[in-house]
């Protein structure tokens, strides 16, 4: 496949580097509307937390308007690009929010909001989607409607549902929906996805033990909430090891053990908090049931009262077969390395709510393996790889042109 070049500045060098792209967007690369690297770094300098992405939303809306899209602002930002007479529509989603993390990077575009950081690559996700909007606005070689969905508050699992509750899909009906998430440690531009469950659910639990406090020198006079809590912590681990099938992909983690005890005072109360990840809804429901049974059984044995709360923050993300096949085909057309049946991920994504409403696909794309690009998501020294920006934008454009292809005889010349 012949290639053309899109130039962008290197992170580590003063000279320019060439990013190879397929000829399908050869006519697009002369576009000067958006400097993707500058835009991404601007987003990185000005991170905003979930449901407070006000400056971010304003910047996105202004860019989409400048590109000639119809723009609608609400919980998030929606850009509408129509071409031809086709009645098909697809949605492309990017998340906007940052994390409450102090950045420890030393590059010249570190967060200017201390304690807030784009540590999950949402700055890059937004920029890739805006790049795709620029490509498609300049050369709308498709037939139908593209709905660009810029979503708030992914990190708390609330933004997607908020957009749905606002009636976004009733106002802008789509037949399919797609999202990209970068994957640190994977080779740059490597696309991986799968049909079926790709991201786990996340549930939070809180167990409150009401014992009887007493003097540390006379434990027999009380009901030690710490000892009871420790027994529960150990017993909860048997859910994964003895109650569920091997390979179920369930994780049960106690992350907090809180008491009201003092140096010489046995606590009368203890609180256990933690996190559960599950690949399948039935496993998530089984964990909730078993957690309650185990905790209440141990409490009864010790003669104390107990309460168990179990709340699901993120549901499982389930990719539909048709959109997943489309992603694999588009990635292949772009010459990208593709893993079409990757292992499910243990992290969670509220894009799941979009996939529950319409057939969709979440794909992962490699962020690179060196330096800050290989650091884990949510690490204070993580960074999105700018070399991925044109790759992601070109992929989005390819997917749109594939899924909203013009009727035979109306195809444009993309060479």
Question: Positions of the model-derived regions?
Answer:
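Short, Lys/Arg-enriched N-terminal segments with co-localized hydrophobic residues
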Residues: 14-30
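Acidic/His- and Gly-rich active-site-bordering loop/insert found
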Residues: 26-118, 123, 127, 134-142
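Divalent metal-coordination and catalytic microenvironments
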Residues: 43, 92, 122, 148, ...
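Histidine/acidic-residue-rich, glycine-tolerant segments that coordinate divalent metal ions
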Residues: 77-80, 99-101, 106-117, 123-124, ...
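Metal-dependent amide/peptide-bond hydrolase catalytic core
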Residues: 230-415
């Amino acid at each position: 496949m012949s290639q053309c070049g899109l130039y962008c500045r290197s992170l580590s060098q003063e000279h320019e580097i060439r990013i190879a792209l397929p000829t399908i967007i050869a006519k697009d690369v002369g576009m000067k509307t958006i400097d993707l690297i500058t835009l991404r770094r601007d987003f990185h300098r000005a991170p905003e937390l979930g449901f407070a992405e006000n400056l971010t939303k304003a910047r996105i809306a202004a860019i989409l308007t400048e590109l000639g899209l119809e723009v609608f602002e609400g919980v998030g930002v929606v850009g509408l690009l129509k071409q031809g007479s086709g009645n098909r529509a697809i949605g492309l989603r990017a998340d906007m929010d940052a994390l409450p993390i102090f950045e420890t990077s030393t590059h010249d575009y570190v967060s200017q909001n201390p304690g807030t950081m784009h540590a999950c690559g949402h700055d890059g996700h937004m920029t890739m989607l805006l790049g795709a909007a620029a490509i498609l606005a300049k050369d709308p070689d498709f037939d139908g409607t593209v709905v660009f969905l810029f979503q708030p508050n992914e990190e708390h699992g609330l933004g997607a549902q908020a957009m749905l509750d606002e009636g976004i899909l009733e106002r802008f009906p789509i037949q399919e929906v797609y999202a990209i998430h970068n994957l640190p440690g994977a080779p740059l531009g490597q696309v991986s996805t799968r049909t079926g469950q790709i991201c786990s659910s996340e549930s939070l639990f809180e167990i409150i033990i009401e014992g009887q406090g007493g003097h540390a020198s006379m434990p027999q006079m009380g009901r030690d909430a710490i000892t009871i809590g420790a027994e529960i912590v150990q017993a909860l681990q048997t859910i994964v090891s003895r109650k569920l099938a091997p390979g179920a992909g369930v994780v049960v983690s106690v992350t907090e053990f809180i008491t009201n005890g003092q140096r010489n005072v046995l606590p009368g109360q203890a609180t256990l908090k933690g996190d559960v990840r599950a690949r399948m809804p039935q496993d998530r429901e089984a964990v909730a049931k078993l957690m309650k049974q185990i905790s209440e059984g141990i409490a009864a044995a010790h003669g104390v009262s107990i309460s168990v709360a179990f709340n699901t923050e993120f549901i499982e993300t389930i990719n539909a077969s048709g959109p997943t096949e489309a992603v694999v085909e588009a990635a292949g057309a772009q010459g990208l390395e593709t893993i079409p049946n990757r292992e499910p991920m243990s992290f969670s994504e509220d894009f799941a709510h979009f996939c529950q409403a319409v057939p969709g696909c979440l794909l992962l794309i490699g962020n690179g393996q060196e330096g800050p690009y290989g650091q884990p998501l949510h690490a204070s020294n993580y960074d999105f790889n700018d070399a991925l920006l044109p790759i992601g934008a070109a992929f989005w454009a390819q997917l749109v042109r594939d899924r909203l292809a013009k009727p035979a005889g109306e195809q444009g010349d993309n060479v």
